[in-house]
Amino acid sequence: WIMGHMVNAIEQVDEFLDLGANAIEFDVDFDDDGVAKYTHHRIPCDCGRLCTKYAVFTEYLDYVRQVTTPGDPKFRKELVLHALDLKLQRISSEKAYAAGVDVATKLLDHYWMRGWNGGRAYILLNIPLVEDYEFIRAFKDTLRKEGHEQYNAKVGINFTGNEDLDEIREVLEKLGEDEHIWQADGITSCFPRGTERLKKALEKRDTPGYKYIPKVYAWTLVRSSIMRRSLRLGVDGVMSNYPDSVVKVLKEKEFSDKFRLATYADNPWEKFTPI
């Protein structure tokens, strides 16, 4: 999975897909009451990126629904995953539940269309800190109360704050979640980052019987050398400001017979087992 990073303006969606991304990450900005208002990162953001691009959240969902609905004139078959970078750290953790209700409701109304020809892409809920776990509970509660639990099959969870992996597992256990999980490891492209925690996540992923990390991605990679380093370690995904650079690296002899781009037929919640 090549995840285009910080794809917050509507016009950027096709731009990043044209560069080779098959997944997009966008920031969800909330007001003080936990209402999702905009796809907006705010300042500061990654080096070399414009931090001010944004869209109204519901309008953005309307657009990516069209891009991921077969038969729609805007349909792009390559876009198979949306990663929602939920900016919950900007609001009180007491509002995390309200935020979960709001995001689930807006996805039902503007993306899934409550079953009426909605978008087909998978949804990854990127939560910054384990203290905001009530967002997940609220999201699932809302799907159940609205009679649309079928969409749980399309939804995954990812804690992105580089917290202790065992602490993350404990929170997932508390929530009763042991599937549809990704584990991210990374830092803004402005700073270097070692591989110690990334290696630990991959080790857990590859431990037989361990259910809490079936997929791992590294972020935000901009240098080809760091992309190669992550691929050699065996990550499932790379988040980058430059999807075209990831595509070039994947075409190199070292990687071309080991990796391919994920398609809609690939389940993003299953641990990959080489044939």
Curated annotation (Swiss-Prot):
Dermonecrotic toxins cleave the phosphodiester linkage between the phosphate and headgroup of certain phospholipids (sphingolipid and lysolipid substrates), forming an alcohol (often choline) and a cyclic phosphate. This toxin acts on sphingomyelin (SM). It may also act on ceramide phosphoethanolamine (CPE), lysophosphatidylcholine (LPC) and lysophosphatidylethanolamine (LPE), but not on lysophosphatidylserine (LPS), and lysophosphatidylglycerol (LPG). It acts by transphosphatidylation, releasing exclusively cyclic phosphate products as second products. It comes from the Eukaryota. Its EC number is 4.6.1.-. Expressed by the venom gland. Keywords: Cytolysis, Dermonecrotic toxin, Disulfide bond, Hemolysis, Lipid degradation, Lipid metabolism, Lyase, Magnesium, Metal-binding, Secreted, Toxin. It comes from Sicarius peruensis. Binds 1 Mg(2+) ion per subunit. This is Dermonecrotic toxin SpeSicTox-betaIIA3ii. One of its GO terms (molecular function) is metal ion binding. One of its GO terms (biological process) is lipid catabolic process. GO terms for cellular component: extracellular region. InterPro entries: PLC-like_Pdiesterase_TIM-brl. Its cofactor is Mg(2+). Mg(2+) binds at E25, D27, D85. Disulfide bonds join C45-C51, C47-C190. The lineage of its organism: Eukaryota, Metazoa, Ecdysozoa, Arthropoda, Chelicerata. It catalyses: an N-(acyl)-sphingosylphosphocholine = an N-(acyl)-sphingosyl-1,3-cyclic phosphate + choline; an N-(acyl)-sphingosylphosphoethanolamine = an N-(acyl)-sphingosyl-1,3-cyclic phosphate + ethanolamine; a 1-acyl-sn-glycero-3-phosphocholine = a 1-acyl-sn-glycero-2,3-cyclic phosphate + choline; a 1-acyl-sn-glycero-3-phosphoethanolamine = a 1-acyl-sn-glycero-2,3-cyclic phosphate + ethanolamine. It is found in: Secreted. Its main location: secreted. It is an enzyme of class 4 (lyase). The active site is at H5, H41. Belongs to the arthropod phospholipase D family. Class II subfamily.
